[in-house]
Amino acid sequence: RMSRGLGDVYKRQIYFIFRKEVVQMDALVEGLMEELNCETVFTIPLFGGIPVYESVVVTWIIMAVVFLLCILLSRNLSVENPSRRQVVVETAIKGLNDFFTETVGEKGKAYIPYLSAIAIYIGIANLIGLLGFKPPTKDMNVTATLALMSIVLIEVAGIRARGTKGWLKSFAEPMPIILPINILEVFIKPLSLCMRLFGNVLGSFVIMELLKMVVPAVLPAVFSCYFDIFDGLIQAYVFVFLTGLFIKEATE
């Protein structure tokens, strides 16, 4: 009887532990679905109603902030007596220009403004979660659009540098036998850019939730700081760096 009673106690303990784990996993799945779900903020009453999602509104906010900063930072510029603000801005712009020049090469300099704009947007989009907004990069539509824009620009850069015939001929280089692989690569590049950015941003949420389950205090706050700041900036760097390398490959 005593051994049977101990067995029942162990069974109940295992049952409660298992039930607790199931509840926690259900909460994780529910939180993940909330992160994937993009809410409709309002609807434009045209063509039967055009929904405007949260990621679009946050993108508009980012665009407005960047636009206002550009106006404020470009006021009262002077060649002879530059202010500290002007020196800081010029140093930052020169740094971006030098970095992207090394990445895309001399032939790809015309695409540096695009790469700079994308880097600034993705960086701010990944950091905007610190202000309570949902980062637009958690919406796969946003990351897919960024990837498609970049790939279209890469192919256009290749056509401009080599001409239409040279661009078509490049698919059969270095050997005609790898033509299918080169064609497939055109579709693989945007997919890899999209999934890398989306997966890393979403993966940070999953890791944070798992850490909260295991160590509910202190440690999650430290990792939250890392994922919200450093990982977001790293993903912006990786996206534009790969895009720059693809442009260099297409133009040389």
Show where each model-derived region lies.
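Single conserved hydrophobic/aromatic residue that forms the stacking wall/gate
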Residues: 1-13
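Selective transmembrane helix interface/packing segments
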Residues: 14-252
